[in-house]
């Protein structure tokens, strides 16, 4: 409902210059990212005659454990994603985009820091108490399905994404995307098939300081690989967020991202339930129009398929 309201307000708002929006966001947990073409795609104002470049680095700590007599799921890893993107306007209404990514999965080094961080906030993560520090683990054993055994890998190519966008209103856009299975990583990290999605974003400039954005996404990912029998093919996502300018070109942002379940009937809450995450941080702008992002992402649904904590860094040029 908040997303639909934001879309309606954006459609009714008078046309004009659209202010900068929120940073992009996509799931990084391999059991989620390997099953969806959906993400949060920020609104792109018209920039004639220039290429827009983006670079983003995400480093995440994931700890999820589910164990019942007939099935077991463990993900204990630190995850790296470095994404490079390019886009260009073809007309005031249409644009194209493409991005590629480098990924990594490690035993890591952050567990001690995260114990202190969660203790400071009074957050209890029992899964961390049951696991040794900085030890990699990634496997899924489901009843009547072949087991998935993920392994660490220092650096590998992820899937590639291509898209065509249309601004259907001065503050509303739709982007059709496809992902190509270009991953060179081990089993359990790439999609393995072509997937497709439609990402819709609405931007609402509330004032000179405050702007809101909401999104709705629909996607299709064919069943594939070891866990094919338990995978959903039709997927949906939504988000609602805001950006508040503090002074000059410096802003705070927050974005709540929701994704429907990626799997079904596994008896594993971390696989069968929806994904809910809060992305937040600061945006530092320059007089040249460049923008830098420093942020974090927290899992708001610990029993769902998310990660414990993501550190986010990025830039737009």
Residue ranges and their predicted role:
Residues 15-56:
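Outer-membrane beta-barrel biogenesis signature
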Residues 23-28, 58-81, 148:
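Surface-exposed strand-loop-strand hairpins of Gram-negative outer-membrane beta-barrel proteins
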Residues 55-61, 98-102, 174-180, 214-220, ...:
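Transmembrane beta-barrel strands of outer-membrane/channel proteins
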Residues 116-148, 227-317:
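Outer membrane beta-barrel transmembrane domains
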Residues 101-233:
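Outer-membrane pore/translocation modules
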Residues 42, 57, 82-88, 98, ...:
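Residues on the lipid-exposed face of transmembrane beta-strands in outer-membrane beta-barrel proteins
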Residues 93-98, 170-174, 208-214, 248-254, ...:
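Repeated loop/turn-to-beta-strand initiation elements of outer-membrane beta-barrel proteins
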Residues 76-82, 155-160, 190-196, 230-236, ...:
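Residues that define the transmembrane beta-barrel architecture of outer-membrane proteins
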